[in-house]
Amino acid sequence: MIVTTSPNIEGKQIIEYKKIVFGEIITGVNFMKDIGAGLRNFFGGRSQGYEDELINAREEAIKEMEQRAQDIGANAVIGVDIDYEVLGADNGMLMVTASGTAVVIEAQDY
């Protein structure tokens, strides 16, 4: 499946626009990662634990969006946008949302 932030796919004709599809992931932040991130904040540097969590959440949101597109017969998603939001009273949750337009593009001629 082709997934792109562009509104079209160069060299491909869009045959059918299906609908907007979403993939949402909400993940909690681990207490041990919080401690490590706090120390790195104090001393400077990057928080690998938070970065890994962010990367995993983004990949899962995109994967969920792709699956929803496939479920309705699409073979591509265009105009993809990814949003991030911190949730919870103590900002201990991260929500990642991937959205785009599910479309059917012309088949490959192999």
Curated annotation (Swiss-Prot):
Give the matching InterPro entries: UPF0145_dom_sf (IPR035439), UPF0145_YbjQ-like (IPR002765)
Which residue ranges run through the membrane? none
Question: What Pfam families would the database entry show?
Answer: YbjQ_1
Q: Which family does it belong to?
A: Belongs to the UPF0145 family.
This one is known as: UPF0145 protein lse_0194
Lineage of producing organism: Bacteria, Bacillati, Bacillota, Bacilli, Bacillales
The protein's gene is named vclB
